[in-house]
């Protein structure tokens, strides 16, 4: 810092000033200013003792400004910024002036829904439907045109339903199903260079779940199986094309990125007596990409007057089919023991195991160039850890005060909690989706905390 300040304090650049010193290094702030307004309204109506209806509307509008500003000139008098196209030879700026980028976006959203709940001794039913519309705009103040680019409104809808049937006082079976559309975020509709995606697809979720609950005074069990199809996940990839008149970073819009998530979940609680509770939770998932994907690169074409006359499109393909979804263990189980030896005292031990933890990766890394890379991503080693918890509620009449103590990773295990496949920055050797190609993040070593909670 001292060297930078010394340089900036004695740096006359006659191209800009013969008396003031030019800063070559500065401190800057990133700006994110938001103004949001909205209206939410709901109406509840009881048809009878069994049926409840609810409808509502949600309207919101937001304006977001993104920019950077000069925070500290570090000894100099001014700084020269070259990001604004309106100043080809550079713009002289001082404290508080905008640099690097300056754009504004707007988001206009409106939606409505209708839902109903039916309850009876044997049967509970739930259903809802909703629609929404969202519109984006983007304005880059650092372009000569300073044009407001507005995308067409995007409409979505969703339908959900569920049923619970109580076979008897101990056993109930349930089913849930839903279809949800999610509009792509602004970055996947209008990119930072002003390119608007052509007919962006809504992300689609189709979820089905079937299960049962069983409960007695000493035993509780919940079992469920699920299947979720996630269609048309919206992704983008930045590329250095070197095409066009600028050769700047451009964008590939990926379409048809589909995933299938299915699995089984079991929760069990056993209470032999009032002093002991035993818990077992098990989850097995099979989460994979379903099918390959296509990518579309779009670049604006200009005439001699620098006017946009069309869009050039290039197609790409990505090898995704059958690859595991990363960044989340797909198998896990928890064994728990809870003791309540005296009134107010609670002791608990939780032994947690995680397996089939595939490294995080991005679909854009599987672009097909020649032979498709369909090798499975790296699977990090499974791991287990023990957490201990204790709490004691003080027997003080009229006060709700508890003492708490926690010991996490009590056995001080060393384990890989997260990983990145074929890391760009920390991998070694050929990229073959192996351990030496991965970037790993170790879990937190043993640590503890204690505290006091007071409820009023």
Task: Specify the residue positions occupied by each region the protein language model found.
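Gram-negative outer-membrane beta-barrel transporters
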Residues: 49, 119-122, 227-229, 252-364, ...
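Repeated loop/turn-to-beta-strand initiation elements of outer-membrane beta-barrel proteins
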Residues: 50-53, 122-127, 170-173, 218-221, ...
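Surface-exposed extracellular loop regions of Gram-negative outer-membrane beta-barrel proteins
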Residues: 133-140, 151, 164-209, 220, ...
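Surface-exposed loop/turn segments flanking beta-strands in extracellular/periplasmic regions
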Residues: 1-20, 67-98, 193-199, 237-253, ...
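C-terminal beta-signal and adjacent terminal beta-strands/loops
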Residues: 344, 353-367, 392-456
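Outer-membrane beta-barrel transmembrane strands
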Residues: 23-54, 97-119, 124, 152, ...
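Signature of Gram-negative outer-membrane beta-barrel scaffolds
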Residues: 24-26, 30, 52-168, 190, ...
């Amino acid at each position: 810092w001292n060297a930078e300040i010394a340089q900036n304090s004695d740096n006359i650049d006659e191209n800009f000033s013969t008396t003031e010193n030019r800063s070559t290094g500065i401190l800057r702030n990133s700006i994110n200013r938001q103004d949001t307004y909205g209206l939410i309204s709901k109406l509840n109506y009881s048809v009878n003792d069994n049926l409840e209806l609810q409808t509502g509307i949600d309207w919101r509008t937001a304006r977001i400004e993104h920019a950077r500003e000069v925070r500290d000139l570090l000894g100099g008098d001014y700084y020269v910024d070259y990001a604004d196209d309106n100043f080809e030879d550079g713009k002289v700026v001082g404290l508080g002036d905008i640099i690097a980028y300056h754009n504004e976006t707007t988001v206009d959203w409106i939606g409505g829904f209708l839902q109903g709940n039916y309850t009876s001794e044997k049967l509970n039913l739930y259903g809802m439907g909703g629609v929404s519309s969202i519109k984006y705009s983007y304005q880059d103040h650092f372009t000569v045109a300073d044009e407001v680019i507005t995308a067409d409104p995007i409409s979505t809808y969703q339908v959900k339903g569920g049923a619970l049937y109580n076979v008897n006082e101990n056993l109930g079976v349930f089913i849930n199903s839903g279809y949800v559309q999610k509009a792509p975020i602004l970055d996947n509709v209008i990119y930072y260079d002003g390119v608007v995606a052509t007919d962006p697809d809504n992300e689609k979720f189709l979820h089905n779940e079937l299960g049962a609950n069983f409960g007695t005074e000493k035993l509780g069990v919940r079992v469920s199986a699920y299947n979720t199809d996630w269609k048309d996940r919206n992704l983008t990839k930045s590329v250095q094309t070197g095409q066009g008149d600028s050769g700047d970073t451009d964008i590939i819009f990926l379409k048809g990125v589909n995933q299938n998530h299915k699995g089984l979940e079991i929760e069990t609680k056993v209470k032999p007596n009032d002093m002991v509770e035993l818990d077992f939770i098990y989850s097995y998932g099979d989460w994979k990409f379903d099918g390959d994907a296509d990518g579309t690169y779009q670049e604006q074409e200009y005439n001699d007057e620098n006017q946009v006359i069309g869009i050039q499109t290039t197609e790409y393909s990505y090898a995704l089919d059958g690859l595991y979804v990363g960044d989340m263990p797909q198998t896990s189980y928890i064994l728990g023991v809870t003791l309540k030896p005296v009134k107010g005292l609670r002791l608990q031990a939780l032994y947690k195991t995680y397996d089939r933890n595939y490294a995080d990766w991005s679909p854009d890394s599987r672009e097909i160039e020649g032979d498709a890379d369909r090798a499975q991503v790296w699977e990090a080693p499974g791991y287990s850890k023990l957490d201990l918890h204790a709490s004691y509620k003080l027997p003080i009449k009229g006060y709700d005060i508890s003492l708490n103590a926690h010991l996490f990773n009590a056995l001080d295990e060393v384990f890989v909690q997260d990983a990145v496949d074929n890391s760009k920055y920390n991998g070694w050797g050929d990229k073959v989706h192996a351990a030496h190609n991965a970037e790993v993040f170790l879990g937190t070593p043993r640590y503890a905390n204690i505290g006091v909670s007071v409820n009023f």
